[in-house]
Amino acid sequence: MTRREDGRLDDELRPLVITRGFTEHPAGSVLIEFGHTKVMCTASVTEGVPRWRKGSGLGWLTAEYAMLPSATHTRSDRESVKGRLSGRTQEISRLIGRSLRACIDLAALGENTIAVDCDVLQADGGTRTAAITGAFVALADAVTYLSAAGKLSDPRPLSCAIAAVSVGVVDGRIRVDLPYEEDARAEVDMNVVATDTGTLVEVQGTGEGATFPRSTLDKLLDAALAACDKLFAAQREALKLPYPGVLPEGPPPPKVFGS
């Protein structure tokens, strides 16, 4: 089989590195690297929930996505300087939030909020899928932090793992984890978010200048789910290590009558 320009097989992921505890202050902080794409994902815990959720007893999870000005070959102005977020930034932020909310029992958080921030340090395609995959690991660490602080009503609020990958048709062949060079000329481009229980959270697919048959869609999904299985294995391996920071001390146990 002819290999891709970067030497990979069609079903092969780029070299993947997940570094926990990348920064000190958030409850969860991860640097995830898919080849040359590098995204910092943090999960911060704050007391309280949005106004529309107050009094419900439920927690909330929100997400923001951004790219550093020099994340690509050509520097771009910060969106904060422009005074408004682009449609792309808003779309990806919402995608990350939806994806992570699919795996967590918000009732277990009480009225606390987990804010997930995904900042692209270097972009070479697949930034949104890398952000989701890394953000799940940061979220898992934030849950560990909340559990240690005694703030969870359920000690295991995560029902599954979440990962995402890009797939596409390039040069007539189905390929996974597209770098920018392949993404820019793909005949079909798709992002797939999945759970480690085999279900789908979201599928975003587009024919770039051409249509594609149902059979191609099925093959793309098969390739994406197989790639996600590898991502789940990498997440599990990363999370085997102890929590990378200092955990808070939970509230003291209630006194027993007569003690």
Swiss-Prot record:
GO MF assignments: 3'-5'-RNA exonuclease activity; tRNA binding; tRNA nucleotidyltransferase activity
Class of enzymatic activity (EC top level): transferase
Keywords: Nucleotidyltransferase, RNA-binding, rRNA processing, Transferase, tRNA processing, tRNA-binding
UniProt keyword annotation of tRNA processing present: yes
Alphabetical list of Pfam families matching this protein: RNase_PH (PF01138), RNase_PH_C (PF03725)
Protein name, per record: Ribonuclease PH
Homology family: Belongs to the RNase PH family.
GO biological process, one term: rRNA processing
SUPFAM superfamilies documented for this protein: Ribonuclease PH domain 2-like (SSF55666), Ribosomal protein S5 domain 2-like (SSF54211)
EC numbers: 2.7.7.56
Coiled coil: none
Functional description taken from the UniProt entry: Phosphorolytic 3'-5' exoribonuclease that plays an important role in tRNA 3'-end maturation. Removes nucleotide residues following the 3'-CCA terminus of tRNAs; can also add nucleotides to the ends of RNA molecules by using nucleoside diphosphates as substrates, but this may not be physiologically important. Probably plays a role in initiation of 16S rRNA degradation (leading to ribosome degradation) during starvation.
Annotated organism of origin: Mycobacterium avium (strain 104)
Record's keyword annotation contains tRNA processing: yes
InterPro entries: ExoRNase_PH_dom1, ExoRNase_PH_dom2, ExoRNase_PH_dom2_sf, PNPase/RNase_PH_dom_sf, Ribosomal_Su5_D2-typ_SF, RNase_PH, RNase_PH_bac-type, RNase_PH_CS
The reaction(s) this protein catalyses: tRNA(n+1) + phosphate = tRNA(n) + a ribonucleoside 5'-diphosphate
